[in-house]
């Protein structure tokens, strides 16, 4: 369904230009995306926009000109944004997602991951909007996978704790909200450092220098466009069925260590991998990580919700713009 609004546009004709008022179609379903400048947020914004939703994204440092600039710690600004736009759905992607940064800046991380999330849930409840809070597999300690939504969380690091506390703040302030736990993400990055998966590409490409790669932690790399599709499917199902709420899991289904991901990346681009060295010891530097926090996704699958991109396909799409050897890019893609 769409509504109609009037919009001004400039028409150029020989000798003059005219300001013309035209009717344009505006989708009637409204969605607000927080963290829309980030890797996941960009994908979620694109997914809803291309599916005929009236989509507004907000960010902070990189917001302008495409997105609304909003500090989520400013409760008054958040209130005005939500009450002015009146979204049917809010997808809350904004977070401090880097475990080591959370350890070094715990107060700032807690304000964003917990405080801002609870406030957003309260504002969503006030206008009857369906809130999807993006959480993490790091709420589990990784000792007894796979984890269902009913398993009791036990985070190992402060990042996992802030995400779990964020879940509690959301569900306490909004009984109709949904929590979507997801694992490590990758996708169309603006820079390699944007994802813990894509950041390995330089080490893969510089084959003249050996590189140590973690071969201890089991990960399930998941494409952001798959998570975005799940968010949209969840939102559309909720608009038909108010019982869609609570906690859900989504994840890719290919189990890999960072070493195995790096080898798969090398293989996808026909690059050598003999310089990559698997390290099987538990990492001793940085925030503690769960060994295997695999998520059981059967709850969403039973609802008919899901999408999975094979890792080799997704990583090739994501990384080819960062290829150092441009000859390979030309022969494969042109």
Swiss-Prot record:
This is Methionine adenosyltransferase 2 subunit beta. Signal peptide: none annotated. The modification Phosphothreonine is found at residue 309. It comes from Mus musculus (Mouse). The gene is Mat2b. NADP(+) binds at residues 37-40, 60-62, 71-72, 93, 97, 159, 185. Pfam families: RmlD_sub_bind (PF04321). Keywords: NADP, One-carbon metabolism, Phosphoprotein. Pathway: Amino-acid biosynthesis; S-adenosyl-L-methionine biosynthesis; S-adenosyl-L-methionine from L-methionine: step 1/1. Heterotrimer; composed of a catalytic MAT2A homodimer that binds one regulatory MAT2B chain. Heterohexamer; composed of a central, catalytic MAT2A homotetramer flanked on either side by a regulatory MAT2B chain. NADP binding increases the affinity for MAT2A. GO terms for cellular component: methionine adenosyltransferase complex; mitochondrion; nucleus. SUPFAM superfamilies: NAD(P)-binding Rossmann-fold domains. Regulatory subunit of S-adenosylmethionine synthetase 2, an enzyme that catalyzes the formation of S-adenosylmethionine from methionine and ATP. Regulates MAT2A catalytic activity by changing its kinetic properties, increasing its affinity for L-methionine. Can bind NADP (in vitro). GO terms for molecular function: enzyme binding; methionine adenosyltransferase regulator activity. It comes from the Eukaryota. Belongs to the dTDP-4-dehydrorhamnose reductase family. MAT2B subfamily. InterPro entries: dTDP_dehydrorham_reduct, NAD(P)-bd_dom_sf, RmlD-like-bd. One of its GO terms (biological process) is S-adenosylmethionine biosynthetic process. Residues 319-334 are annotated as: Required for interaction with MAT2A.
